[in-house]
Amino acid sequence: ITPVITFHHFTTPEWLYNQGSWLNPKSDEYFNNYVAKLMKELPKEIVYFNTINEPGIFAYFGYLSTNKFPPGIANETKFIIASENIMSAHKKALKTIKEYNSNAKVGMTHALQEWEDDDDNKLKKYLKYHLEDKFLEASEDDDFIGLQTYTIVRYPKSILLKLFTPLLLNIGVIRKFILPRIIQIFAGRNGAMTKDTRTTKMGYEYRPDAVLYNLKRLNKRFPNKEIFITENGIATDNDDERIEFVTTVLKNCLLYTSPSPRDEAL
């Protein structure tokens, strides 16, 4: 068993929360100090370090979407500030970890879903970038990528969404307040699912092949990095369904590592 240390998994200390949480301009320094303190105590035999778990998720649900994670602000400007501080914290921590352990391999674990093909969907492009791609940009200097995927993101086939989203995204003063509500109404994971769509107990569309989609995606972007599947699974109380899901995921992993071309789908 190879241990992997995770320094941050959603929980923010109350003292930092009371000082503005990730909106605090010193939050990245505070996080780096915390990492340095732990590195002084951790044995050198530990090699793998994950600085932040799913940075896009806790930034999005805490600062852009409504009423999911604390502080539940739902303001685009603050979401961008928090995201920048989170990415800065990761980059500083990466350097600090390597100063204490020259053999360290450092990365982040990213929540990456399969995205429904719809290149004309402006909201899809906006969310995919701010939830996933910009945090992948912050991983350019990382040693490994942690992949955490569960489902596909779909969108309602709404004419209103097509018409008004581009307009909304160009109205700077209004959008920072209205955009979170629009996202909440139109862009949930359930998107365009029908009553016949197979789902898990979490309400996610049953999508074990989403792993293969993201393995290809990551390999295309980071061909020389280690890629670990650090989270995956299904919420179910049916063991047969669980076995089916896990078996399909493993088959997709074998397909990914086979000699056949890996990037044709992306």
Describe the function of each predicted region.
Residues M108-D141:
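Substrate-binding cleft/loops of secretory-pathway carbohydrate-active enzymes
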Residues E76, M87, S139-D239, L250-L254:
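Glycoside hydrolase catalytic-domain groove-lining segments
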Residues E54, A111, T149-Y150, L266:
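Flexible loop residues that form catalytic
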Residues Y256-A265:
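Conserved small/polar residues in nucleotide/adenosyl-binding loops
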Residues S21-D28, D119, N238-K251:
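Short, electropositive alpha-helical surface patch
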Residues I1-A93, S102-E116:
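Substrate-binding cleft and catalytic face of glycoside hydrolase catalytic domains
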